[in-house]
């Protein structure tokens, strides 16, 4: 079962990824994890990636794709994998198809967790931090007992600059524009399924699970 998991920030992608890999016993492969593992193993591509990361530069596609190739060829991917954070562009998706073809595989499912923009803004801008102790709250998911005050020490709660609703909205707009060509690519290949991410976490997983189960039978 070879899966690409997509979704905008705040859609709950990480939560659902954890549930899928636990249920289906496949590796959860994120770009960051791949880079860290390649660097730790001291591979040639890992060292190349590190040199770019140390400079604060983006790792070029050819290095990233090489690391993906090495990762997907490992034995734990034999029965499938879940890719998270890769591919990000159509050229990367085309390179992924080429890698998988060499391995006698293909992407079977691209799962896109959809949440309305207003809901994403509410989720992402609801975080509040205590000025005194740094404790984190969320107005929707983990609100303080008393509005504006930390439960632990009564410290004032504040909103970080990058959690400001306008900043969040702008960030989402950029992400949406970047994601659309990739969604179109997988739609054209007939492997894209949009999942309603505004439901309860367990209901979202039930929908994902039903889809994956039906494709196995």
From Swiss-Prot:
Keyword Repeat tagged: no
Top EC category: transferase
Protein residues bound to Zn(2+): 130, 133, 150, 153
Keywords: ATP-binding, Cytoplasm, Kinase, Metal-binding, Nucleotide biosynthesis, Nucleotide-binding, Transferase, Zinc
Subunit-level organization: Monomer.
Record note on domains: Consists of three domains, a large central CORE domain and two small peripheral domains, NMPbind and LID, which undergo movements during catalysis. The LID domain closes over the site of phosphoryl transfer upon ATP binding. Assembling and dissambling the active center during each catalytic cycle provides an effective means to prevent ATP hydrolysis. Some bacteria have evolved a zinc-coordinating structure that stabilizes the LID domain.
Protein name stated in the entry: Adenylate kinase
UniProt source species: Lysinibacillus sphaericus (strain C3-41)
